[in-house]
Structures are given as C-alpha cells and as structure tokens.
C-alpha cells in the first residue's frame, strides 16, 4: 500500500518591471510531469496527488534576482497562506540557476519547492521528483566519477 502526499501546485509566471512573461507550465503539463514523479517514487510506495492547481499572479522580480534560490523560494511561499499541503511552485526557466529547482523543509512559512521548466516532461518530472526528495530530507549523493562503482550511480535521483 502506498502513502499519498497531497500537493498544492502554483503555476507562477514571472514579470519584469510589470511586463509579464509567457507561462511555460500549465496544470496539464504539471499533471504530465507528476506522472513521471510518481513512476520514480512508486518504488518507495509513495504517490503524490495534486489536490489543487492554480495559475498564480506573475511574480515581478528582476531576472538578475531569480537565481538566488533561497530568496526566490521565500518570496514565492510568503505569497500564500500556509495549510496542511505541500506547496509546489512551477516557474519558467531561470538563467544562471545551478539547479533544477530548490526545496527547503524549513522554508518560511512552510516546507516548499520550486521547479523550473526544462521543456520536456521527463526532465520536468525528474527535477520535481528530486526536489520532493529534498522535502523528505534526502541529501545529494556525492559521486567520485573516477571510481567505477560510484560512477555507475550517476543516474541516481539525488545526484
């Protein structure tokens, strides 16, 4: 029997100086990516369910400030009332962000993640599954690529 985790998904487009950017995510693409997430996490008997999906008002933030993952996640999560769901923010691609998203179990006011758009369902879903791993307190797996046994782990979700 698998455990179900309810998600509240916000499709959050960006704006810069009042000029909105086209949304990359939609509730339909979120559902497609979540199918990839659930295929990955099914091995651990964990299923994620979108309880609610909403198109959020654009977040007006300069492009140069978007790659500060902690700050961005705090700004995103402070825009909404905390509840008993896991909040997921799906955002457009972010220039110079070194990761696919960010997650903080101790984010203010609640545990939350954001995932940037990669342009295809498999990459979007894998990045989302990775961030959910962080919300379940999983750390990155450090790999020594010179070690053949460790290098074989490069496809591990948490690398």
PLM regions: where:
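Intrinsically disordered, low-complexity boundary segments flanking structured domains
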Residues: 33-38, 70-78, 99-105, 138-149
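Active-site-proximal beta-strand/loop segments in catalytic clefts of secreted hydrolases
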Residues: 10-15, 51-53, 89-94, 117-120, ...
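Glycine-rich, flexible loop segments associated with nucleotide phosphate handling
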Residues: 23-32, 79, 149-156
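The catalytic-center signature of Zn2+-dependent metalloproteases
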Residues: 115-159
């Amino acid at each position: 029997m698998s455990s179900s985790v309810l998600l509240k998904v916000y499709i959050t487009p960006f704006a810069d100086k009042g000029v909105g950017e086209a949304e990359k995510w939609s509730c339909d693409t979120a559902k497609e990516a979540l199918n990839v997430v659930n295929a990955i996490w099914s091995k651990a008997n964990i299923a994620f369910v979108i309880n609610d999906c909403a198109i959020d008002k654009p977040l007006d933030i300069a492009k140069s400030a978007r790659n500060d993952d902690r700050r961005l996640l705090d700004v995103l999560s402070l825009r909404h009332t905390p509840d008993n769901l896991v909040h997921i923010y799906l955002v457009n691609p972010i220039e110079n962000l070194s990761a696919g998203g960010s997650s903080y179990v101790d984010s203010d006011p609640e545990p939350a993640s954001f995932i940037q758009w990669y342009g295809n369902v498999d990459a979007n879903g894998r990045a989302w599954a990775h961030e959910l791993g962080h919300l379940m307190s999983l750390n990155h797996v450090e790999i020594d690529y010179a070690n053949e046994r460790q290098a074989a782990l490069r496809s591990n979700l948490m690398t």
